[in-house]
Design a protein with these regions (language model features):
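N-terminal subdomain of nucleotide-sugar transferases
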Residues: 1-44
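Conserved donor-binding/catalytic core segment of Leloir-type glycosyltransferases
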Residues: 4, 174-201, 205, 214
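Short His-centered aromatic/hydrophobic patch
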Residues: 66, 84-90
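Carbohydrate-associated surface elements
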Residues: 141, 162
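Nucleotide-activated donor-binding/catalytic signature segment of Leloir-type glycosyltransferases, i.e.
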Residues: 226-244
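Aromatic "clamp/platform" in nucleotide-sugar-dependent glycosyltransferases that forms part
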Residues: 264
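Short hydrophobic beta-strand element within catalytic cores of glycosyltransferases
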Residues: 281-284
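Conserved acidic donor-binding segment of nucleotide-sugar-dependent glycosyltransferases
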Residues: 296-297, 301-308, 317-323
Length: 360
């Protein structure tokens, strides 16, 4: 099968899709507006379309005006499947390419933030969804947004991404007896609400004398967050690691007592899935994306988005009752990941759908 992805080339998700389906023996092409090198995508046919600056935070309407370049490339490549990752910029532009087997995967903020907050985005994504032969979303909440747009729900499937169990597992788990380790693996952007976590840590730092905090991830707010860390007198506890690879994330999670995600919005919290697979005790914001994985007080804690004191109390509770809490949560989380959180299993659904589309 010849599959052409149309997506942000610097995204981990894009690399993951391209590499996975190449590993299954398919010929993979990537069309992107991002300047990426061939070394970043070995064995993938990369086609970079010069379109001016691309803002990773969104608002890339100028990309749509390049639809004729995309249409021309797609005609040259002649893919069996043309698949856009991200419903707004790439999805809308891809819809204008006119491929009969056009697929859109929504990744989260495209539906949960952009579409909800803008009538222009609503109209654009409604158009793109009409043109798509198949649409995948990562959660029931995203499916509900698609339904609200008037989408034909017979062509919408909920497909969580999940984790690679060869990387994210608890076989190498090793906790320090001298430190209580809290880890965040979310990027340093506004939507991930890292200041909220830092403020909660400030509340508990004197009650957890051996507290160590790992903040993995990169983003535009790093300097601001480092300044806040100093202001809150957390420099002794908090370390910013910047951009790290999947193996480093897994290694850190396996040395962490607690994983915290205080995101304001998520499509499917893959970072949460990774932490569950590595047996870290999970504390996350009480949003739909997290409720599909965590039942509060059963296999983790859910906290209100704006409640710093509530988050602090849950971190402190995890510190005081860690063994009891994790003994209960660990087996539940392992079973959940095994059932519906394995990347390769979930991608079998995608490959089967690709094959069905070709038959029709």
């Amino acid at each position: 099968m010849r599959i052409c992805y149309f997506a942000f080339g610097a995204s981990f998700h894009t690399k993951r899709w391209c590499e996975h389906f190449h590993s299954l023996g398919h010929e993979i092409h990537l069309i992107t507006f991002t300047q990426v090198s061939a070394e970043e995508y070995p064995n993938i046919h990369v086609h970079v379309v010069n379109s001016g600056k691309v803002n990773v935070s969104g608002g890339n309407w100028h990309l749509v005006s390049n639809f004729w370049k995309i249409r021309k490339l797609v005609k040259q490549i002649k893919p069996d499947i043309f698949h856009a990752l991200y419903a707004t910029s790439y999805g809308v532009t891809g819809a204008l390419a006119g491929h009969r087997n056009f697929v859109i995967t929504a990744l989260g903020s495209d539906l949960l933030v952009s579409v909800r907050n803008s009538t222009v985005y609503q109209k654009a994504v409604r158009f793109a969804f009409r043109k798509a032969k198949w649409i995948t979303v990562m959660s029931q909440e995203m499916s509900d947004v698609a339904k609200d747009l008037g989408t034909d729900m017979s062509k919408v499937s909920i497909v969580p991404f999940g984790v690679d169990p060869q990387i994210f597992n608890a076989t190498q788990r090793s906790l320090s007896v001298n430190e209580f380790v809290v880890t965040s693996t979310r990027n340093l952007e506004k939507i991930y609400n890292i200041p909220h976590l830092l403020k909660a840590l400030h509340v508990v730092k004197d009650q957890i004398p051996n507290l160590k905090v790992n903040i993995l991830g990169y983003g535009s707010l790093r300097e601001e967050l480092e300044a806040l860390t100093a202001e809150l007198e957390l420099n002794q506890q908090v370390t910013f690691f910047g951009k790290v690879n999947q193996y480093q994330i897994a290694e850190t999670l396996n040395r962490s007592h607690v994983f915290v995600s205080v995101s304001l919005s998520d499509g499917n919290n893959i970072s949460l899935n990774e932490a569950m697979a590595c047996d870290a005790f999970c504390i996350a914001t009480n949003i739909p994306a997290n409720r599909q994985w965590i039942e509060d007080g059963v296999n983790g804690f859910l906290v209100d988005i704006d409640d710093v004191e509530g988050l602090a109390a849950r971190i402190l509770q995890a510190y005081k009752s860690y063994d009891e809490l994790q003994e209960k949560a660990g087996p539940i989380n392992q079973a959940i990941i095994e059932e519906r959180g394995i990347w390769s299993n979930n991608m079998k659904v995608v490959e089967q759908k690709y094959q069905e589309m070709l038959k029709n």
